[in-house]
Amino acid sequence: MAKKGMINRELKREKTVAKYAVKRAELKATIANVNASDEERFEAMLKLQALPRNASPVRLRNRCGLTGRPHGYFRKFGLSRNKLRDTVMQGDVPGVVKASW
């Protein structure tokens, strides 16, 4: 089980990313716009740099929904490999069976 502080930190980052997503997209579009003047593009770069670090989606980390484990994460299920195996063996995940051949 991951520390509760780490799990809460990730949740806080997700909220921050969602809060600034539109503003970041607008600034990045201005920077990428070749028709904008150099001054406008430079101002947009400065504004983008002034945003909080945790507003960048690159800083997000996928974590297991049950334990908070950061490694061995399956996006389709939102669980780490350990908890996914446990839930599949209990029959809680429909349509998934243990492989045998």
UniProtKB/Swiss-Prot annotation:
Record-level GO cellular component terms: cytoplasm; small ribosomal subunit
Keywords: Ribonucleoprotein, Ribosomal protein, RNA-binding, rRNA-binding
Alphabetized Pfam families for the sequence: Ribosomal_S14 (PF00253)
Residues in coiled coil: none
Any GO BP: translation
Keyword Calcium appears in the UniProt entry: no
Annotated InterPro entries: Ribosomal_uS14, Ribosomal_uS14_bac/plastid, Ribosomal_uS14_CS
UniProt KW Ribosomal protein keyword: yes
GO molecular function: rRNA binding; structural constituent of ribosome
Family: Belongs to the universal ribosomal protein uS14 family.
Described purpose of this protein according to its UniProt entry: Binds 16S rRNA, required for the assembly of 30S particles and may also be responsible for determining the conformation of the 16S rRNA at the A site.
Subunit-level organization: Part of the 30S ribosomal subunit. Contacts proteins S3 and S10.
NCBIfam families: PRK08881.1
HAMAP family attached to this UniProt entry: Ribosomal_uS14_1 (MF_00537)
Name of the molecule in the record: Small ribosomal subunit protein uS14
Organism: Acinetobacter baumannii (strain SDF)
